[in-house]
Amino acid sequence: MKYLTLLCALLLSSCYEVERNCNEFKTGTFESKITIDGVQYNSIFSRTSKLQVEEFNGVKDSTYVRWINDCEMIFKTIHPKNLAEQKDIHLKILTTTQNSYKFEYGYVGDTNKQLGSATRID
């Protein structure tokens, strides 16, 4: 009986697929929320298929956007001001809802990832 219950649980859980309708979020205006070391940071950004302009703490920053696939992209800062801004950022959309998505991001080649969410505001 234990094995039957375990088998049923495995079969049911393997059928669940996370919704990822990433194409709905390739362009638009969004509010992003990330938490780093227990502090939440909010920003507003607008994205076209090739460019993203973000405002954080009153400072605007522009990046080129290169889509790797439907749910992953690389950001390259247009006018980097320091070495950290010269590093490209990889972002992967993990899950989507009707008007928001959860994502992970980090420097290209770095195993350290941060999590965040973005909500469409346009």
What positions do the PLM features span?
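Bacterial signal peptide processing site
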Residues: Y16-V18
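Tryptophan-anchored aromatic micro-motifs
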Residues: C22-G38
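Short, exposed beta-strand-loop hairpins at the edges of beta-sheets
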Residues: E54, K102-L115
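Positively charged n-region of N-terminal signal peptides that target proteins for export
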Residues: M1-L4
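A short, structured loop/turn motif at beta-sheet edges
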Residues: Y64-E72, I93-S100, R120-D122
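C-terminal motif of bacterial Sec signal peptides marking the signal peptidase cleavage site
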Residues: L11-S14
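An anionic, turn-rich surface loop/hairpin at beta-sheet edges
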Residues: F75-Q98
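N-terminal glycine/threonine-rich, aromatic-flanked beta-hairpin/loop signature
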Residues: Q40-I68
